């Protein structure tokens, strides 16, 4: 018998029966025979045949394929050490950064990424001893470094709420605040605005979503907040016009694109 007993993004508690049959159990779950149960309080995340539960609280627990924002904390001979907010530091090897042949004896890797730089990568592999390997190949901006802006850190389980259904929430924030935003699935968000006031407004909206993620009518409240603040900025002469939204965003219930990536629209 093959059956899923819960909905994607459903809040579950430890011991909740999630699925039965040939599904793969991910983080936050355990298997007993053919049945998969939750081990934590969190949100169900279903990707293909894999079922995991994202804890409501606690550090980011990486999964292969996650797009993450990280900070370079050390530069080694042939790799970089990256903080992605997980219990363990991640590694970015030179071969996962570029296909170009690099003479490591003559090249200082700090010319590419230095300590303190912010990068955008994908979790490539996780070993049994929790070694986390990243790759920046094929990522927007070639993985970075991401210049300017600020890093906002939210609870990882609330990332889908920030993104919204089909990107509705984050695209609304980007459109109205005229900012560049990249959302990492580790809960780190890069925000780069045209000016300080717009950047702060985008951050205010994101943090409000983080605080109120499990409440109804959040999309309307975020829209109201943004329009109210923008009207104030217009009256002060900070901006000339308030951008118009092409479509009314719908209240988000799930994330269709699981990569957590957003770009300027």
Swiss-Prot record:
GO cellular component terms, semicolon-separated: cytoplasm; exosome (RNase complex)
Q: Where in the cell is it found?
A: Cytoplasm
Provide the residue span(s) of the region labelled Disordered.
Answer: 241-265
Q: Which residues form the S1 motif domain?
A: 65-137
Chain's role? Non-catalytic component of the exosome, which is a complex involved in RNA degradation. Increases the RNA binding and the efficiency of RNA degradation. Confers strong poly(A) specificity to the exosome.
Q: What is its main location?
A: cytoplasm
An example GO biological process term is: poly(A)-dependent snoRNA 3'-end processing
Keywords on record: Cytoplasm, Exosome, RNA-binding
What is the organism lineage in this UniProt record? Archaea, Methanobacteriati, Methanobacteriota, Thermococci, Thermococcales
Q: Where does the record place the KH domain?
A: 147-205
The protein here is known as: Exosome complex component Rrp4
Is the keyword Cytoplasm in the record?
Answer: yes
Q: How does it assemble?
A: Component of the archaeal exosome complex. Forms a trimer of Rrp4 and/or Csl4 subunits. The trimer associates with a hexameric ring-like arrangement composed of 3 Rrp41-Rrp42 heterodimers.
A Gene Ontology molecular function term for this protein is: poly(A) binding
Answer whether the UniProt record assigns the keyword DNA-binding to this protein. no
Can you name the source organism? Pyrococcus horikoshii (strain ATCC 700860 / DSM 12428 / JCM 9974 / NBRC 100139 / OT-3)
Member of which family? Belongs to the RRP4 family.
Where does the record place Acidic residues bias?
Answer: 241-254
